[in-house]
Amino acid sequence: MRVYTIRDDRIVYLGEYELVPMPKLEDDIAAIKGSIIAYVLNSNYSSFIGALKDTKEMELIENLAYELHQNIDRTPTLTRYYYLLMKVYGMHGSILSQF
């Protein structure tokens, strides 16, 4: 499928993409939670690592992942993770280099 976007009142061709089945919501949330944990572990946020072990913190992440799942375009995957992390932790664009 050809994908286009609009920039500065012009139609811009982004490329050819294959349509794939959407994952189940539970799988998507698990993947997002795993990416958050991986990012935190690689960032030496030791106090935050401790917080992640708290069940309430994991519930918060799961709730935010669910909320984001309902409101953000589900492609591409990295964009979803980026926006989730920006919303939860207020991090900057360099986060994409972590995945």
UniProtKB/Swiss-Prot annotation:
Domain of life: Viruses
Name by which UniProt lists this protein: Uncharacterized 11.5 kDa protein
Organism of this sequence: Thermoproteus tenax virus 1 (strain KRA1) (TTV1)
